[in-house]
Amino acid sequence: MEKAFRPHFFNHGKPDANPKEKKNCHWCQIRSFATHAQLPISIVNREDDAFLNPNFRFIDHSIIGKNVPVADQSFRVGCSCASDEECMYSTCQCLDEMAPDSDEEADPYTRKKRFAYYSQGAKKGLLRDRVLQSQEPIYECHQGCACSKDCPNRVVERGRTVPLQIFRTKDRGWGVKCPVNIKRGQFVDRYLGEIITSEEADRRRAESTIARRKDVYLFALDKFSDPDSLDPLLAGQPLEVDGEYMSGPTRFINHSCDPNMAIFARVGDHADKHIHDLALFAIKDIPKGTELTFDYVNGLTGLESDAHDPSKISEMTKCLCGTAKCRGYLW
């Protein structure tokens, strides 16, 4: 497969190359990313002759869909910290909703850290154990802040941290692995896609030939949803991210009942809580070449009882993760 694309690259680099064909080329889409030279994405198939869906498009940021409400500019605000170091402490406005640190890693002075990441030593830049275990939301600084792009509280904003390889598995379609070691607590990448309304998500489910299959690619942005919220953007039905036809490499990550990564809600500008990022962090050390996985249905209950109900089992989707902790069914 890799050899077959060498002339493909060459032809797309010619002045008379077909622009439409180049635009729809997965390899050209990947090569256009600013991070490609340092953190390349590769596609490898050593199992069969399958190719990625030609209708799929690689993107490096989520796309806001039709009728998706966005916060008014007057509600947007960033921190006014005098230095990047200030963005680790309770005085940083971006961290107002983070719980103060209370472990042995806390600042030795009077100020308490609310910062989600370790700030020094071998764990610098990794997600703190407290946050990793609780899966509480992560609040970061952003482009509207006074701090620099090197601020230690802009981990997710700076983007993917490792090269990734999309590969063909023996029995689960495409999967993703990393050619370098990943540390526990390390940010890997975001789950990207088209951000759509709940009504549009339901319409797409209804139009899908296999509704349950569509759910594999739809993720609700419901971390902050609250029908009693005074913020109308949070009181309504949550938006959803559809990664089926436009996404990044994480779209191809498979499910596991014993995963090595987990999704965290990451907030930049607090006015954008309803369209928060879905950030993937390693929850254990991941040796290079290991398939990356996360739990598609983390927190879902009732699967075991449904699996023993003859009226429901025929509609359930079998899990193929093959781990010792496999629940038997995805949903």
Swiss-Prot record:
| GO cellular component, as recorded | chromosome; nucleus
Report the Pfam families cross-referenced here.
Answer: Pre-SET, SET
Annotated positions binding Zn(2+) 2: 79, 94, 141, 145
The GO annotation for biological process reads:
methylation
Q: Which GO terms describe its molecular function?
A: double-stranded DNA binding; histone H3K9 trimethyltransferase activity; histone methyltransferase activity; zinc ion binding
Q: SET domain: from which residue to which, for each copy?
A: 162-297
Give the principal location in a single coarse category.
Answer: nucleus
Q: Where is the Pre-SET domain?
A: 77-159
* Residues binding Zn(2+) 1, per UniProt: 79, 81, 87, 92
Where along the sequence does the record put site: Interacts with H3R8?
227
Report the subcellular localization: Nucleus; Chromosome
InterPro entries in the record: H3K9_Histone-Lys_N-MTase, Post-SET_dom, Pre-SET_dom, SET_dom, SET_dom_sf
- Record keywords: Chromosome, Metal-binding, Methyltransferase, Nucleus, S-adenosyl-L-methionine, Transferase, Zinc
Which positions bind S-adenosyl-L-methionine? 172-174, 215, 217, 251, 254-255
Q: Where is this site: Interacts with H3S10?
A: 209
What is this enzyme's class at the first EC digit? Answer: transferase
Residues that hold Zn(2+) 4 according to the record: 257, 319, 321, 326
What happens upon changing residue 330 to A?
A: Reduces enzyme activity by over 99%
Where along this sequence does the record place binding of Zn(2+) 3? 87, 141, 147, 151
Question: What happens after mutating residue 222 to Q?
Answer: Reduces enzyme activity by 97%
Residue stretches making up the Post-SET domain: 315-331
UniProt catalytic activity: L-lysyl(9)-[histone H3] + 3 S-adenosyl-L-methionine = N(6),N(6),N(6)-trimethyl-L-lysyl(9)-[histone H3] + 3 S-adenosyl-L-homocysteine + 3 H(+)
* UniProt domain comment: In the pre-SET domain, Cys residues bind 3 zinc ions that are arranged in a triangular cluster; some of these Cys residues contribute to the binding of two zinc ions within the cluster.
Give the family from UniProt.
Belongs to the class V-like SAM-binding methyltransferase superfamily. Histone-lysine methyltransferase family. Suvar3-9 subfamily.
Instruction: Briefly state the protein's biological role.
Output: Histone methyltransferase that specifically trimethylates histone H3 to form H3K9me3. H3K9me3 marks chromatin regions for DNA methylation.
Protein's UniProt name: Histone-lysine N-methyltransferase, H3 lysine-9 specific dim-5
Q: Which organism is it from?
A: Neurospora crassa (strain ATCC 24698 / 74-OR23-1A / CBS 708.71 / DSM 1257 / FGSC 987)
Organismal lineage: Eukaryota, Fungi, Dikarya, Ascomycota, Pezizomycotina
